[in-house]
Amino acid sequence: MNIVIKKEDVIDIVSRSVAILNRQLQQQQQPQLLGIDEFTRHFAEIDWTNVWSVITTASERYMTSLSEGEGSITLTLSMPPRYTLEQAPLQQTYKNVSAWTIMSLYAEKNAAPANVLQVISQQANVYLTLLRESLAGHRSAPIRKEPQKVRNIDKINWL
């Protein structure tokens, strides 16, 4: 299964996410993440090495190869054929992880206020967890456990 992550798609997610984040912070009258317009104009300067590092670390168990093209990265994951239908949501999760990783790096580099760093960090972790769970779900069907035998039927709290 090939997962293609295009930088332009990731930047689009970053732009929209930052706009939403700033609106929420503005409503709460809290400091915002500034300088995003300049950031999106100069996204070529972003050090993508860290972004790919986060992604590949999350995927290393399933990744068979990685190739960096012009403005994109292609991950080849070893997944059974029956999961190819789930490729689109998985691809979107990768883009979200990339976007929120960039936002984390950008916020840290530009000494964003603590409240902004916290929100970004939480959101980045949500997507990273989602990615790990998505990949783990591809491993195999869940192991069926035998139902536990009830030892003392009188002690069951029947509601």
Which functions belong to the PLM regions below?
Residues Q28-L34, K109-L117:
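Charged, low-complexity interaction regions
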Residues M1-Q87, E133, H138-S140, P147-L159:
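Conserved short "hinge" loops at termini or chain/domain junctions
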Residues A112-P147:
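Preference for long, well-ordered alpha-helical segments
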Residues F43, E86-Y94, A112, V119:
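Conserved aromatic-histidine-acidic binding/catalytic patches
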Residues P80-A88, S104-A114:
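Short acidic, glycine/Ser/Thr-rich loop/turn "cap" segments at secondary-structure junctions
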Residues Q92-Y106:
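Elongated alpha-helical scaffolds
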